[in-house]
Amino acid sequence: MAAKMAFADKPNHFINFPLAQFSGFMGKYLKLQSQLVEMGLDCKLQKAPHVSITMLDIKADQYKQVEFAIQEILDDLAAYEGYIVFDKPHMLGRCLVLDVKGFEELHVDIVEILRKMGCTADQSREWIPHCTVAQFEEEKEINAMQFYYKLPFYLKHNNILTDSRLELVKIGSSKIDGFYCSELSVWCGERLCYKPPTPKFSDIFGYCCIEKIRGDLEIGDLPQDDEEAWAELSYHYQRNTYFFRYVHDNSIYFRIVCRMKGCMC
């Protein structure tokens, strides 16, 4: 009998796509909120505009799996390149929200990766991508409000690196300057800024380097067998995948060899 799929129906975290860094979007978003104020409506304005990509029920010791899942998505981000469209202001329960289109494939894939890594992701109810504008004390009818914005979602757009980020946020976290305080935040342009300095791992690293790299990382990050560790590092180095970036961030020795382009043993 197949195992029953677990859902995050009592979530404690979510994957967040923040929007406060996009000035074009924010100009229209704040104008929409000002209309609510001018109409004299009693509501709580959203101070950290965002799109929730998926909900999670996880523990703090699973943060690394979440980070690796996000990094794995970034390795294939070209598959999701296009535009995110915000339009059709309407009520969803007690909230005034914008419809959001363009994150559908990203949602499906990140949920799949998170589940493979042992994280409880997504909810049993249908995921409805939206961006909250304001919350009311009770359900209301809001008519005749207009909004449309088309946001480029690319690693690089017109020779400018993206401002997009994917973040892990604990539910109930505080908000500062339009952003949630996050447990981790990964810049979507990170992959373009991390490039292995040589075509092959063996061009600058030797087997003698493995133990020094392993010593900089957490227990279990690399296989204990040196040949297996070498094969894993070589694979990710030559493909510039998420584990290369993780080791580069966390191993001082690894960074020195990459910078010097030569083994330091």
UniProtKB/Swiss-Prot annotation:
Source organism: Rat coronavirus (strain 681)
The protein's name in its UniProt record: Non-structural protein 2a
Family named by the database record: Belongs to the coronaviruses ns2a protein family.
